[in-house]
Amino acid sequence: MTTATRISRARADRLRPHLEALASAPPAGPDPIDYVHRYTAVPDREVAALIASSLAFGRVAAFSGTLDQIFVLADAGGGPAAWAASALTQDDPGLQPLFYRWVRGPDLQRWVRTIARFMEKHGGLSVFMKRAVSPRDKDISQGLAQLVDALRSLALDPGEHEFQSLPRGFRHLLPHPKSGSACKRLCMLARWMTRSSAPDLGLWPVSPHQLVIPLDTHIHKVARLLGLTRRTDGSWRTAVEITRNLRRIDAEDPIRYDFALAHLGISGACKGRRIASICEPCALRPVCKVGGIG
């Protein structure tokens, strides 16, 4: 069993300026939150965020093609919120031929119906999360679990009784924190909606210190290089461990470096091994296990 990693205060102090330098650099490349920034009304942003975050797996260039087509339909339907609401009476046939990997058109239609039912019943994500998350909660995991439970229950059509009986493609859109999965896309949604600093939106009445880092292969690789974890599994426990160590760097906003760290990997600017032409200009080189002296 891997011993839990807890960085020292001195290590936190050493990491902080280099993470700040990385975070201050202009963002590299597109990001799924760009779809949410197309809209100004809160209901539109909430619906757009649910859709964009849920399909943000794999390469950005791959899933963005499907998202582009979905948001063309949404805009033609009066914007994401109005378009989703129309699914309460009729699915958009334009979704039928769309797909991304194992998520098929009927899964997307069910997802939009589910979102519409949620918005109608709960009045929006912000209203729901205000009830689901207490200031006393150590992190947002219980609130996210309640959100997933609510969405899963609303995904069932008449005659359906078990979420696990639904198609694999749809089930992939709604992972559960209690399953042990890192729930990267769910944590990314929470980051978008909670933090108020760019590029995030600050719509949820949740404290940033309760967020858990959206753990994917890029974040995991860089976190190991920085000594934020020794764990090799991309699990919820690993995400929590990395977040706890980031809290030693910034107790109030531990995942403020997530956007920059993720794009370090997404852009190809970190290969996980020393390549002088890549490592030398990197802001993290002095504190990286392979790029510098660690």
Name each model-derived stretch.
Residues 1-294:
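HhH-family (HhH-GPD) DNA N-glycosylase catalytic core used in base-excision repair
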